[in-house]
Amino acid sequence: MDTEPPENWIIDNSNMPEVGTIEWRGWSFASMDFWVDAEDQLRSQFIRADGTVAVVDPDEWDDCENAASFGSYNSILISPLIQLTGQPINISFDSHYRQEAPQQVSLTVTNSSGEIIEMLLHYSSDSGSDNDSGDVLNQRLSFIVETDEDEIYLKWEMYDAGNNWYWAIDNVTIQSQTPPIGDLNYDGNLNIFDLLTLAEILVGVISPDTVLNHVSDINQDGETSFSDLILFLIYIMNH
């Protein structure tokens, strides 16, 4: 059990009472066994979890001192600063969530100044929310983020909770959204403009970055060569 986040991650508990069960005050990091031993109540159904999970659990927090009577449970888990390269990124994680009003959770994207750019997920007791007011147990969630910002943070937040339920996440991955093979101008199409870009790479006009080098290797033999140009030309002529 650990109430400290991994390196470069931040927990913000500044907007909740300094009471309750200490190990469950705000986002905590626990083994599945430790968490389930507190009380099962469907916690054990998070079978996607592997090792230590990140948990917000106002149900267990409230068991000491009737903590929710002092104010609502509000906690934010903030990712390290994510540098962007102008390409979309994919955020994926395993999630295990039980709903009870007035508890709400969200996943938001903010810029380096903390301003919200996009809300990727919102669960609440409202039938119009992403969970349709119900539980969302043992799911793999995935989101694409496209923004002009150079740097962003991700924020997993629980707020307005009393003696309610919980949210656990695990296996967070943040990856570049690599364009399809051959889409050298990243416009979603394979056409003559991509062929011209490939020719420019081969004659040295363009020095490809890692992503561009991947999508220009048409035959996926580990290098970009004139055989890729011929193969791509044949494809363009037949489509």
Spell out what each predicted region is.
Residues 1, 77-79, 84, 88-99, ...:
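Extracellular beta-strand-rich recognition modules
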Residues 1-64:
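Extracellular glycan-recognition surfaces and repeat-rich motifs
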Residues 64-84, 138-141:
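Short beta-strands within extracellular/lumenal beta-sheet-rich domains
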Residues 70-73, 159-176:
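Extracellular carbohydrate recognition
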Residues 101-107:
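Beta-strand acidic-aromatic groove motif in beta-rich domains, primarily in extracellular
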Residues 177-239:
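Cellulosome-associated attachment modules in secreted, modular CAZymes
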